[in-house]
Every structure is written in structure tokens, then in C-alpha cells.
């Protein structure tokens, strides 16, 4: 994988445990995160650490191979699916998507017990090597679309 790839999918949910909705394009802002997703809004007095979640298509495929399953990526409940680029395994890195969106990584997106409800063994399959993805906060607003370039800036 390289330092540049593409945005392969966008998903959001309007409430906890809500159904994931995939979209082709979306506005992502510092104030609200992914438009239409319940997790992105900044709460007064809080530092937003989990506005956006990203997962690599290659990591999802590896988890599916380990599990022997074929589950759609959005069942991971991540907002953005990237392909052809390795997401940073550290906090403070900047991911650029499209012309304007910038996301600062805030940590690993550890798989939760909800993954076991989707498929037995899924949590364990997502645990190694940051397969569950990364979390981030928006530092520069932007409208993004499936197919946009994804770059690691720092």
C-alpha cells in the first residue's frame, strides 16, 4: 500500500445502534463530523476524539478471510472505507480526503462486543494490527465523495 489511495465507501447512522446508511457524497465538518451521523457533533466542553471512524478495505478483507465470512464493510459501523493506503497507526497523523477534508487521528478504533452480534469471532478477527480502523477528529471541513483521493499528510 502507498501513501495515497482512494475513498471506497461512506456510511453513517443517525442514532446509536441505528441502521447504517451508505451514501456517495457527504459534508464532513469540525462542528458536526459526518453530516447525518450521530457521533460527530462536538459537545460543549469536550474534545472530539471520535468524530469520524475509518477502516482500510484491505484490513476488512483480512478480517473476513480470517473469519471465513463475507460481511459488508459498513457492518463494522465505520464511517469511511479507504482502499490502497495504509492508515497511520498513531495519534496526531493527518489524513487528507478530497480537496479540503483533513482528519487528525486520535487513536485505534477497538472493536466492541457489538461485532460479536454481527458474527461470532468478528471482534477477535478485527483486533490485531489495528484491523478495526482508526478514529479521528475533523480539523478542516470538506465535502467528500466515493472515489476521492486519500493521502497521509503527516
Residue ranges of predicted features:
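Metal-cofactor-dependent catalytic cores
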Residues: 1-154
Amino acid at each position: 500500500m502507498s501513501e495515497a489511495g482512494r475513498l471506497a465507501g461512506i456510511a453513517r447512522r443517525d442514532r446509536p445502534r441505528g441502521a447504517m446508511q451508505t451514501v456517495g457524497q457527504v459534508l464532513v465538518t469540525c462542528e458536526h463530523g459526518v453530516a447525518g451521523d450521530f457521533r460527530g457533533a462536538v459537545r460543549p466542553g469536550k474534545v472530539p476524539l471520535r468524530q469520524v471512524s475509518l477502516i482500510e478495505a484491505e484490513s476488512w478483507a483480512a478480517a473476513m478471510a480470517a473469519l471465513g465470512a463475507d460481511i459488508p464493510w459498513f457492518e463494522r459501523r465505520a464511517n469511511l472505507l479507504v482502499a490502497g493506503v495504509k492508515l497511520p497507526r498513531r495519534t496526531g497523523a493527518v489524513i487528507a480526503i478530497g480537496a479540503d477534508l483533513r482528519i487528525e487521528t486520535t487513536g485505534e478504533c477497538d472493536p466492541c462486543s457489538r461485532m460479536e452480534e454481527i458474527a461470532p469471532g468478528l471482534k477477535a478477527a478485527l483486533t490485531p494490527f489495528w484491523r478495526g480502523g482508526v478514529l479521528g477528529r475533523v480539523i478542516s471541513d470538506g465535502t467528500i465523495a466515493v472515489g476521492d483521493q486519500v493521502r497521509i499528510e503527516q
